[in-house]
Amino acid sequence: MHCAYFERGTCRSCGWLADPYADQLQRKMARCQSALTGLGGVWLPIVPSAETAFRNKAKMVVCGDASSPCLGILDADDDGIDLSNCPLYPTAITEAFEPLKQMIRRLGIPPYDVKKRQGELKYLLITVSEDDDSLMVRLVLRSDIWIERLRADLSTLTADLPHLAVLSVNIQPVHQAILEGEQEVILTDRETLTVHLNGLPFHLRPKSFFQTNTRVAEQLYATARSWVAEVAPVHMWDLFCGVGGFALHCADVIPGQVTGIEISAEAIASAQQSALELGLKNVSFHALGANEFIDQAVSLPQMPALVVVNPPRRGLGVGLCAFLDESVVQTVIYSSCNPESLARDLVMMPGFELVKAQVFDLFPHTAHSEVLAMLVRVR
């Protein structure tokens, strides 16, 4: 992939970009295998990505001033670097940058100055649905004083940006490296952005977590579904389920109950909306932390034979690993964005062995990757 920002040295977010893509894949495979050395298992071929225009989400720091805004990143001196032509983004996102800059200029919204600790607009977050190029745009502001002016400008912005489906404001008042605050105000009639994966609808709300590489995510979920079908359990849990990616994909191969658990109430609302639209009677979603759920699960009349887990980078942790290891669960399908924490968790579950694993390149040109692993009980 050719990137003028990388060649000039102004942006090094894609740390592996100097390496040919085939070499990147080999390095990722070797890194993941090395992290899980001695744990057994068969490694399936790595699933590659498109090299450009694969990201469905842009997180842009807003810099400069209201008359000349800059969308991109901060350098080491907290000065802005405009990345409006970043090749990671599809056309629908890159074409949205100029209308959004025009809106900032039109309303005179001052970008937040990190060094001076003053200003209002901190981030622009843009998500695209590859279904129809519709967009969800979030403005992260220091205060709510611009909300009514943004609402009054909505018809103008929509005329300039006809693919806009959802516009929201997030209030993040503190001077800290925190992306978003608690308060979210949606300014459009629509509250969700619809994205289809493998024909299944997902309704994204502004705070919903969603994999940033749509096409590779489809392959991740399809592979997990095929592995679940191989095991053919009666019931299944999906822990850290987000908007229901694994649960919804697996529902048609589970004759019993599929239960999704996720701490984010907003993500659970999205998952429930998808299940209702699909007419799924055997799927339920609950807004609970995974550890809170397992505290309640010990009293349930039946445990599933299979559990899917997709924890954050830190992994499952001691408590959840111990619960799974001591339970009657026979198979764990573990989706991990951190092979080191995956390896730590496997060591803490000696009752299971790694049967197979596959790397999915959700994050090209970086050291990051997603590993899907099947663990089967041996004692």
From Swiss-Prot:
It holds the Pfam family tRNA_U5-meth_tr. Catalyzes the formation of 5-methyl-uridine at position 747 (m5U747) in 23S rRNA. Keywords: 4Fe-4S, Iron, Iron-sulfur, Metal-binding, Methyltransferase, rRNA processing, S-adenosyl-L-methionine, Transferase. The active site is at residue 337. It catalyses: uridine(747) in 23S rRNA + S-adenosyl-L-methionine = 5-methyluridine(747) in 23S rRNA + S-adenosyl-L-homocysteine + H(+). This is 23S rRNA (uracil(747)-C(5))-methyltransferase RlmC. Belongs to the class I-like SAM-binding methyltransferase superfamily. RNA M5U methyltransferase family. RlmC subfamily. The keyword Iron-sulfur applies. The keyword S-adenosyl-L-methionine applies. Its EC number is 2.1.1.189. It comes from Halothiobacillus neapolitanus (strain ATCC 23641 / c2) (Thiobacillus neapolitanus). It comes from the Bacteria. GO terms for molecular function: 4 iron, 4 sulfur cluster binding; iron ion binding; rRNA (uridine-C5-)-methyltransferase activity. GO terms for biological process: rRNA base methylation. [4Fe-4S] cluster binds at residues 3, 11, 14, 86. S-adenosyl-L-methionine binds at residues 211, 240, 262, 310. PROSITE patterns: SAM_MT_RNA_M5U, TRMA_1.
